[in-house]
């Protein structure tokens, strides 16, 4: 979820999010949920040798995330979809090389099922439901000018 912080400046300054691949869903996980699962796994019996695949409780597209952002901030934030060429140019400007760009494109144009499949792992390991993107946004609204 913290990847959404990349939008903070444009949301504060212009009230917009510029992002590519508007139909690509992801089941982002809250960093606190990662920490909670790790804490249980490290301090409780029965976790030796276990692998845990973690997701958030919902798979959202970028426009859906922006709608949540607007709701939490109490103001309209506009979603502007970038073309594939525009997003690739942006990644290159940020210093990403060919291998990284190819990986990013694959993850967005043909993501693995694990990237958008909601799993119950956080609840199963911690006994608490995974935090939603709306909860994360509420905790981080100040970064977006809220």
PLM regions and their residue ranges:
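Oxidoreductase cofactor-interface core, primarily capturing Rossmann-like NAD(P)-dependent enzymes
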Residues: 1-78, 82, 89-94, 99-100, ...
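A hydrophobic C-terminal alpha-helical subdomain
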Residues: 85-146
């Amino acid at each position: 979820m913290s990847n959404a912080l990349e939008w903070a400046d444009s949301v504060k300054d212009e009230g917009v999010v510029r992002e590519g691949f508007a139909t690509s869903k992801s089941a982002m996980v809250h960093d606190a949920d990662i920490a909670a699962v790790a804490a249980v796994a490290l301090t409780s019996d029965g976790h030796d040798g276990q692998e845990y695949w973690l997701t958030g409780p919902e798979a959202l597209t970028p426009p859906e995330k922006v709608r949540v952002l607007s709701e939490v901030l109490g103001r309209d934030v506009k979603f502007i979809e970038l073309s594939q060429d525009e997003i690739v140019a942006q990644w290159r400007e940020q210093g990403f090389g060919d291998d990284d760009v190819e990986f990013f494109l694959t993850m967005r144009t043909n993501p693995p099922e694990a990237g958008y499949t909601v799993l119950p792992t956080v609840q199963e390991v911690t006994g608490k439901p995974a935090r939603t993107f709306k909860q994360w946004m509420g905790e981080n609204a100040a970064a977006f000018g809220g």
